[in-house]
Design a protein with these regions (language model features):
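Catalytic nucleophile-loop/oxyanion-hole region of alpha/beta-hydrolase
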Residues: 125-127, 132-133, 147-185, 320-327
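N-terminal secretory signal peptides and thylakoid transit peptides that target proteins
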Residues: 1-16
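Mobile cap/lid helix-loop segments that gate and shape the active-site cleft of serine hydrolases
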Residues: 80-87, 217, 226, 233-267, ...
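Short beta-strand element of the alpha/beta-hydrolase
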Residues: 110-118
Length: 343
């Protein structure tokens, strides 16, 4: 059977059940959830005018020279197209230097989104969780930056910090060039999907954590998003319920202290930005409890949170739920919400 996103992500999160075993044993034994009969990747969102091209006209490498913790031999780029011919998805692997792809609206209104695609930290799904985001929100006047972040299992050290380093650095680089991009740096938020939702949640709860040595003046700026959208997110590597099912998703063999540190649901404070969540109740890969626990923790911390939980939708739908699904309205609801919450 052709490899698809849910197979790979399922293997990634399934490995978390074996967190106490060696990395090699985890890799060999990680179960892959069976796909529902007839399942196909979601149809790419293509409004009038067609989708923007990849790569974008403006691509900005985030790190001058080698990124932090680089291996002796950098990963080699390995983009692939996946899924049936009518529903192809572009996946990025082999990320040697994190980069942001800039998508500018015809009439910028000053708002901006850092879009963080998912992929189980094994690839970056830039089609339905990057290009589609740019197309939709550009039409509303929002400048979109799609983050292609380094993948932990491609040789970086410490592996579990590489994505957060990239997310922090992206926020700072964007803010350092706000005038050039015609955005208000105070209106820059983040929108993350699945593993990218984990990274977005990690960013909003660890934006001030020192995870790399400053490299230039941009690193004096804040990495804190003004707001966050978390779409079917993994919100903790160890969940409040005690489940360790996501423990190996980011990097095998992490210590309990590192697992706690990279479990953003446990780190929500009065400083955490407002959040908007979307999660299908029937998601077979990232359980709805991830979002429910986030809401409970946000309420305990007194932080605003809003959510949409369609009964049906599965995982990885991006902006592509069927029109007769009430959850298909989430991009419009989120767009309205962000205008009231800093965007």
């Amino acid at each position: 059977m052709a490899t698809d996103r849910r197979t790979v992500l399922g293997a990634a999160v399934g490995g978390g059940l074996l967190a106490a075993q060696s990395a090699a044993a985890q890799s060999a034994a990680a179960p892959t959830p069976a796909l529902p009969a007839g399942w196909l990747p979601p149809t790419p969102f293509v409004p009038s005018g067609g989708p923007p091209a990849w790569p974008s006209r403006e691509v900005i490498g985030l790190w001058p020279g080698k990124p932090p913790g680089a291996p002796a031999t950098l990963p080699s780029p390995a983009p692939t197209m996946n899924g049936p011919a009518v529903r192809r998805q572009l996946w990025i692997r082999g990320v040697a230097n994190a980069e942001i792809h800039v998508f500018r609206p015809a009439r910028p209104d000053g708002s901006a989104l850092l879009s963080i695609p998912g992929g189980g930290y094994q690839f970056v799904s830039v089609q339905n969780e990057g290009l589609d985001v740019a197309q939709y929100f550009n039409a509303l006047g929002t400048t979109v930056f799609v983050l292609v972040y380094r993948l932990p299992r491609e040789g970086w050290s410490p592996a579990h910090l590489a994505p957060l380093q990239d997310a922090q650095r992206a926020m700072r680089v964007i803010r350092s060039r706000a005038t050039e991009f015609r955005i208000d740096p105070a209106r820059l938020g983040v929108l993350g999907f699945s593993a990218g939702g984990h990274l977005a949640a990690d960013l909003i709860t660890a934006h001030s954590e020192t995870v790399y040595a400053p490299v230039d003046a941009a690193d004096q700026l804040s990495a804190k998003p003004a707001f966050a959208g978390l779409i079917y997110p993994v919100t903790g590597l160890i969940m409040q319920s005690g489940s360790r099912r996501y423990a190996a998703m980011l990097s095998p063999g992490m210590s309990d202290a590192d697992l706690q540190a990279r479990s953003p649901v446990r780190k929500i404070t009065a400083d955490t930005p407002s959040t908007f969540l979307v999660h299908a109740a029937d998601d077979p890969l990232v359980v709805l409890d991830c979002s429910l626990e986030w809401i409970a923790a946000a309420r305990t911390a007194g932080r605003p949170v809003e959510a949409m939980f369609p009964a049906v939708g599965g995982h990885g739908f991006g902006l592509n739920l069927p029109k007769d699904n009430s959850g298909a309205l989430w991009p419009d609801v989120f767009a309205r919400w962000l205008r009231k919450n800093g965007g």
